[in-house]
């Protein structure tokens, strides 16, 4: 089964990604150290209470400036307005839980 993570992004950054304008450097979020292993990231946008979409990452390029990897976006799935699954929040600090909604488990098969 493909590895999955949940990430939180700023609204402007998410829109740059879905418009194809932004490469993504996610060494700290990647659930693997192998740049050839694909993974899915479900995206929560700061200031909202819903998941916005899913990004499929596959492959990585070495970033000469940071020495880390710049993970390559292969496909972006966005959830239609009004049909987004709600995010789950920790009661203590209001941060999104890095879980994975069961509805989207089939995307990883």
Place the predicted regions along the sequence by residue.
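Structured alpha/beta reader/binder surfaces that contact nucleic acids or chromatin modification marks
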Residues: 1-109
């Amino acid at each position: 089964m493909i590895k999955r993570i949940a990430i939180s992004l700023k609204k402007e950054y998410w829109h740059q990604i879905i418009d194809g304008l932004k490469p993504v450097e996610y060494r700290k979020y990647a659930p693997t150290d192998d740049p050839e292993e694909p993974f899915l990231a479900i995206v929560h946008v700061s200031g909202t209470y819903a998941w916005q979409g899913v990004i499929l990452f596959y492959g990585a390029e070495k970033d000469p400036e940071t020495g880390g990897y710049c993970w390559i976006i292969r496909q972006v799935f966005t959830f239609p307005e009004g049909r987004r699954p709600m995010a789950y929040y920790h009661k203590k600090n209001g941060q999104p839980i890095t879980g994975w909604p069961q509805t989207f488990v089939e995307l990883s098969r």
